A protein has these predicted regions:
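Terminal, contiguous helix-loop blocks that mediate binding/assembly
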Residues: 1-25, 29-172, 180, 201-487
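Short Gly/Thr/Asp-enriched flexible loops that form oxyanion-binding sites at enzyme active sites
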Residues: 21, 185-197
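Subunit-assembly interface segments of extracellular/virion macromolecular structures
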Residues: 173-174, 195
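A phosphate-binding catalytic loop at a beta-strand-loop-alpha-helix junction
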Residues: 178-186
Length: 487
């Protein structure tokens, strides 16, 4: 059983993990048996983190209710997301709540026996501005990697890090997600990589951690935030997108000189961006999903498919650098704008899962008397069960919202017509008209016809949850091939 430990650092880390979860829900194949998500974020109330954790919990409940074996063709929810190794997903950072940075580093205590300030005090005052020192940390480092580099170094002393190290096997891999233009990601990536490669020999599993293949994606600027024009300068947000590029250049310069311990490093960013509301963090920071986050999640898929990644004594044999590009410039990306290798990974899974979610949302209530539902007793008891009414319905809504957010972002990713069109159901893929089939039925009546034709081939002794998802996968796969030319 191979595992991929995915460290998501800061808000960008959580959002890329969200996109990865959506890809796995849709059935994108990834070359590991389990994903182990680990989030490093001092923002205790981060909305993006909260939403991602809820999504992964729903995903896991669905995955555990479905059999995945050679007999069942279903690919939806096919990869296990292991939430047991790091309960709650987040690796805690101690002593960062209700405290400012100068208290955290013990600045007032940097005195000798006579009460005179020590050289450490002078050094700290030189390294950190007065605003840095007075900064609180409960919502993160607010674009200050110099603060993050001090605070984040403590996570290796946590019980969660010890549990992580002990669970790593010799066939496992590690992947790190971070942004480069803020505070948490820019400081967290180099620190985490250093601590993984130089892990103490006293920890259980240390050799497996030290020599595990490590990949990373570093996300360059892809959005802006509105300036905070509060007349009280002391109350202005510390997040200033005017500094994103200069911070990126500084970090890239550091990476070039010092970052050579990863096996594969992916770079991604965009020069077209949307301006978000300025929020330093907490429950108000809810960024819409973005194509860049989806592409960053595809870096994780790519990494698992790379063979022969070796490391000896904490040093990789060589470092590979990769970038992502679309086939042609487009402010609104459709499938036709993507390279063939990307389409081979995502087009069928995203299309079939979108069909599944739209049917459940738009049509299912009108079709519960169809043979496919009656013959397998998909009745009120089933549709009111926790599996369907909570986990699957919440996942459906989150997925469709994820697609809608990407379609409304800049640069937009809009491969599907998401609006409800019951008289034109299969005009789903933007720019690709549906094929004609030999049938007197159309739209959702044709959808039901495919469900009815496939339901007789299901094993009758399986769990209802399994039968439901398997039936829809089989019917949608055949329907997508016939109407949408999806192979």
């Amino acid at each position: 059983m191979s595992k991929l430990y995915v460290f998501g650092i800061g808000g960008t880390g959580s959002r890329v993990l969200k996109s990865l979860t959506m890809l796995l829900a849709a059935g994108v194949k990834i070359n590991v048996d389990e994903i182990v998500p680990i989030v490093i974020d001092p923002d205790h109330a981060a909305a993006d983190l909260t939403r991602t954790v809820k999504l992964m919990q729903d995903y896991n409940k669905i995955h555990e209710s479905i059999d995945h074996n050679n007999y069942n063709k279903n690919a939806f929810f096919g990869t296990k997301i292991n939430l047991d190794i790091i309960p709650g997903v987040r690796m805690p950072l101690a002593n960062t709540e209700n405290i400012d940075f100068e208290t955290y580093i013990g600045l007032p205590m940097m005195t000798d026996e006579n009460g005179n300030y020590t050289p450490n005090y002078a050094l700290s005052k030189m390294l950190f501005s007065e605003k840095n020192l007075k900064s609180t940390m409960e919502v993160g480092f607010k674009g200050n990697p110099n603060i993050g580099s001090v605070v984040l170094n403590q996570f290796v002393m946590s019980d969660e890090f010890t549990n992580f190290a002990a669970s790593v096997g010799n066939n496992d891999r590690i992947f790190i997600i971070s942004s480069i233009f803020g505070g948490t990601g820019a400081s967290g990536f180099p620190l985490l990589l250093k601590n993984l490669r130089a892990i103490g020999n006293t920890k259980s599993g240390c050799e497996n951690v030290k020599n595990a293949p490590i990949g990373a994606v570093t996300v360059l600027p892809y959005f802006d935030v509105a300036p905070d024009n509060n007349p009280d300068e002391e109350k202005r947000s510390e997040i200033d997108s005017a500094t994103f590029i200069s911070k990126t250049k500084a970090a890239l310069s550091y990476y070039e000189r010092n970052m050579n311990e990863e096996n594969v490093l992916y770079y991604i960013g965009d020069n077209i961006s949307k301006q978000y509301k300025n929020s330093e963090g907490g429950s108000t920071q809810k960024n819409d999903a973005h194509f860049i986050e989806l592409a960053a999640a595809l870096a994780i898929v790519d990494f698992t498919n790379m063979p022969d990644l070796k490391c000896k004594n904490g040093k990789p044999d060589n470092v590979t650098y990769k970038e992502f590009a679309i086939k042609q410039e487009a402010k609104e990306i459709a499938f036709s704008d993507l390279d063939g290798s990307t389409l081979a990974i995502i087009k069928k899974p995203l299309t079939t899962f979108t069909m599944f979610c739209k049917y459940m949302k738009e049509q299912l209530a009108e079709s519960i008397h169809q043979p496919w539902a009656k013959d397998h007793k998909f009745d009120d008891n089933f549709f009111n069960s926790t599996f369907y009414k909570a986990y699957l319905t919440d996942m459906r809504e989150a997925y469709l919202q994820w697609l809608a957010e990407m379609a409304g972002n800049v640069r937009a990713f809009r491969p599907f017509v998401l609006e409800e069109k019951k008289k034109d159901v299969f005009s789903l893929i933007v720019g690709e008209p549906p094929a004609k089939v030999l049938s007197l039925k159309s739209n959702y009546a044709l959808f039901d016809d495919y469900l009815n034709s496939k339901q007789g081939k299901l094993k009758t002794d399986g769990k209802k949850e399994q039968l439901f998802v398997e039936l829809f996968y089989n019917a949608i796969e055949a329907l997508a091939q016939a109407k949408l030319r999806i192979q």
